[in-house]
From Swiss-Prot, chains A, B:
Extracellular side: 29-51, 102-129
Name of the protein in its database record: CASP-like protein 1C1
Positions in the Cytoplasmic compartment: 1-7, 73-80, 151-164
Gene source species: Arabidopsis thaliana (Mouse-ear cress)
UniProt cross-references to InterPro entries, sorted A to Z: CASP/CASPL, CASP_dom, CASPL
Entry keyword Amino-acid biosynthesis: no
Species lineage: Eukaryota, Viridiplantae, Streptophyta, Embryophyta, Tracheophyta
UniProt keyword Secreted present: no
Amino acid sequence: MVKLTKRIGGLVLRLAAFGAALAALIVMITSRERASFLAISLEAKYTDMAAFKYFVIANAVVSVYSFLVLFLPKESLLWKFVVVLDLVMTMLLTSSLSAALAVAQVGKKGNANAGWLPICGQVPKFCDQITGALIAGFVALVLYVLLLLYSLHAVVDPFLLQKS
Amino acid sequence: MVKLTKRIGGLVLRLAAFGAALAALIVMITSRERASFLAISLEAKYTDMAAFKYFVIANAVVSVYSFLVLFLPKESLLWKFVVVLDLVMTMLLTSSLSAALAVAQVGKKGNANAGWLPICGQVPKFCDQITGALIAGFVALVLYVLLLLYSLHAVVDPFLLQKS
């Protein structure tokens, strides 16, 4: 019975991670706002920033991976390799979220030392939607860290909870 | 004999990771250049960018952790917990390197969509030293990923190399 609940627990975490990564992807891709600035009409979209494009690619990869792993048979030896792939996905989410956050922070506050003005004053809705995508990306990351700790706990017992 | 070589291998990886994280920290902290721009004298330093400050803090944490773990007794049960801490350090290095890279990329190329001009034209030596710090940070990250795979391999055998 315990094994069954553990297995279902793992699948639920993976399903939630799939949902969060997909949401982050969709919210980021659909973030766009038109604004006029000194009589010039501008449109802000996620493709304007390399870090946001990286965020989209990373969450797309994680979404596909999370979906495929749901169909891996229980007895498959590949589950041993899934631990390493979970690690890779966790690093990909960590990296893309951090890069997008760093650039979003500059977009929100600007950087006086570098002479970069903030942009969120002109395109507030765009910035709010980017924030939403980053939150969804953070949820996906937390779920993947839980998945990793869950896999590590099953094999390494790092918190010494199992009676030896 | 195999166990001894494995143990020494682990310690050498940790020592190298300690050296790389410390180098990244020192190179980033000492990066500074004075430049004059439209008769204004400016000094570029790592504290100008939040992402670079984050990079310094992360590599400082990893350096201290890597140094302390070197003194952990072989038989200690804490080694089981070190796998989780190695994961945390790997994520910290991934995150801080990605954030610093995202901002450095904007510093090097600017971003026309956001109206941000590149800065490396005015402070080329500063940018070169930042690049050096990011390379050292990347080496520390690669070493930590190897350490993680090494720990996972010892307990999970994800590449199914051990004869069952």
